Amino acid sequence: MAALRRALIILAHSEKTSFNYAMKEAAVEALQRKGWEVAVSDLYAMKFDPIISRKDITGALKDPENFQYPAESALAYKESRLSPDIVTEQKKVEEADLLIFQFPLQWFGVPAILKGWFERVFTGGFAYTYAAMYDKGPFQNKKAVLSITTGGSESMYSLKGIHGDMNIILWPIQSGTLHFCGFQVLEPQLTYGIGHTPPDVRTEILAGWKKRLENIWDETPLYFAPSSLFDLNFQAGFLLKKEIEDEQKNNKYGLSVGHHLGKPIPTDNQIKARK
């Protein structure tokens, strides 16, 4: 019998009548049907505080006269002095094999409440260290997927669309947040123009999401340039190794959205996994 898998769904939408809430409900149903244990962090329902502050640390601060949140929160994590709400969320993350982030795209990024969740929960020492980041990060054995709704149509987020390439929009979240902490990032579930989508199509989208979730653990993650391609020290500047740079000179495309090397970006690098 396969080992029990655990999923954590982080929902960032205020309304239970929203399509985002319906996507969350569909995910819970589909995963539980396949034997997953599912936890949900409904950030609005929880009244989650997205603002980083001194209140996140219990006990004496290391340097109260020159408060620096990253250093103080990392030390507080190490010494078990983080506030209870942060500890609760970190425990959920620790226990999960798969994280699903369900949210509407707002101003080309995550909603403020979810941004605050990342800033408060993904503390130094817990979610990253500079000695262990990206594919060597603390969460390298976990998987994550973004399930996003947009107001604009798919064409608006295309290469010729007025909003620009969706791959560019996804890079800071998928690489700069999730993969930076080690997650294997799966193809995003993108639901475009949901406000203009008729009920029958919405039903089809929910059914397709449920179907995908049946085997989501077996999916191939998105490609990111491995950390082994870089000189990982401050003296070298964490730059691409010279021999790798030389190897890439004759390639038509760059390595990824962020590591394009001045060349065309690989098609759908942040939307489709390499086959």
From Swiss-Prot:
One Pfam family hit: Flavodoxin_2
Known function: Flavin-containing quinone reductase that catalyzes two-electron reduction of quinones to hydroquinones using either NADH or NADPH as electron donors. In a ping-pong kinetic mechanism, the electrons are sequentially transferred from NAD(P)H to flavin cofactor and then from reduced flavin to the quinone, bypassing the formation of semiquinone and reactive oxygen species. Regulates cellular redox state primarily through quinone detoxification. Reduces components of plasma membrane redox system such as coenzyme Q and vitamin quinones, producing antioxidant hydroquinone forms.
Entry protein name: NAD(P)H dehydrogenase [quinone] 1
Cofactor requirements of the protein: FAD
GO molecular function: NADH:ubiquinone reductase (non-electrogenic) activity; NADPH dehydrogenase (quinone) activity
Segments crossing the lipid bilayer: none
Organism: Cavia porcellus (Guinea pig)
Organism superkingdom: Eukaryota
Cross-link type Glycyl lysine isopeptide (Lys-Gly) (interchain with G-Cter in SUMO2), residue numbers: K252
Annotated positions of the Phosphoserine modification: S83
Keyword Transcription recorded: no
Location within or outside the cell: Cytoplasm, Cytosol
Ranges for region Important for apoenzyme conformational stability: 226-275
GO cellular component: cytosol
Enzyme class: oxidoreductase
PANTHER family (alphabetical): NAD P H OXIDOREDUCTASE-RELATED (PTHR10204), NAD(P)H DEHYDROGENASE [QUINONE] 1 (PTHR10204:SF1)
Entries under Gene3D superfamilies matching the protein: 3.40.50.360
Swiss-Prot/TrEMBL keywords: Cytoplasm, FAD, Flavoprotein, Isopeptide bond, NAD, NADP, Oxidoreductase, Phosphoprotein, Ubl conjugation
Enzyme Commission identifier(s): 1.6.5.2
Record SUPFAM superfamilies: Flavoproteins
DNA repair recorded as keyword: no
InterPro entries per UniProt: Flavodoxin_fold (IPR003680), Flavoprotein-like_sf (IPR029039), NAD(P)H_dehydrogenase_qn (IPR051545)
Lineage of the species this protein comes from: Eukaryota, Metazoa, Chordata, Craniata, Vertebrata
Binding site for substrate: A127, Y128, T129
Assembly behavior: Homodimer. Interacts with PDLIM4 isoform 2; this interaction stabilizes PDLIM4 isoform 2 in response to oxidative stress and protects it from ubiquitin-independent degradation by the core 20S proteasome. Interacts with TP73 (via SAM domain); this interaction is NADH-dependent, stabilizes TP73 in response to oxidative stress and protects it from ubiquitin-independent degradation by the 20S proteasome. Interacts with TP53; this interaction is NADH-dependent, stabilizes TP53 in response to oxidative stress and protects it from ubiquitin-independent degradation by the 20S proteasome.
Similarity remark: Belongs to the NAD(P)H dehydrogenase (quinone) family.
Residues where FAD binds: H13, F19, N20, Q68, L105, Q106, W107, F108, T149, T150, G151, G152, Y157, R202
Gene Ontology biological-process annotations: cellular response to oxidative stress; negative regulation of ferroptosis; negative regulation of protein catabolic process; removal of superoxide radicals; ubiquinone metabolic process; vitamin E metabolic process; vitamin K metabolic process
